[in-house]
């Protein structure tokens, strides 16, 4: 199982989204909420209250 790159939630097989940047770094997201917060809004996970530690 993969974990979300933003909230560290486990992602089940066949769900979620993989985002690959031009530099080759790979991010896995469990929801569009996590994807938008990290990619579009540029938020840091440790500063967001709803993210698991």
UniProtKB/Swiss-Prot annotation:
Keywords: Metal-binding, Ribonucleoprotein, Ribosomal protein, RNA-binding, rRNA-binding, Zinc, Zinc-finger. A zinc finger (C4-type) spans 4-34. SUPFAM superfamilies: Glucocorticoid receptor-like (DNA-binding domain). One of its GO terms (molecular function) is structural constituent of ribosome. Its cofactor is Zn(2+). One of its GO terms (biological process) is translation. GO terms for cellular component: ribonucleoprotein complex; ribosome. Binds 1 zinc ion per subunit. Transmembrane segments: none annotated. Zn(2+) binds at residues 4, 7, 30, 34. Binds to the 23S rRNA. Part of the 50S ribosomal subunit. Forms a cluster with proteins L3 and L14. HAMAP family: Ribosomal_eL24 (MF_00773). Belongs to the eukaryotic ribosomal protein eL24 family. This is Large ribosomal subunit protein eL24. The lineage of its organism: Archaea, Methanobacteriati, Methanobacteriota, Methanomada group, Methanobacteria. The gene is rpl24e.
């Amino acid at each position: 199982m993969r974990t979300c790159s933003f909230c560290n939630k486990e992602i089940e097989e066949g769900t979620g989204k993989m985002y690959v940047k031009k530099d080759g770094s790979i991010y896995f997201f469990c929801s569009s909420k996590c994807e938008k917060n990290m990619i579009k809004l540029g938020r840091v996970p440790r500063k967001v209250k709803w993210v698991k530690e």
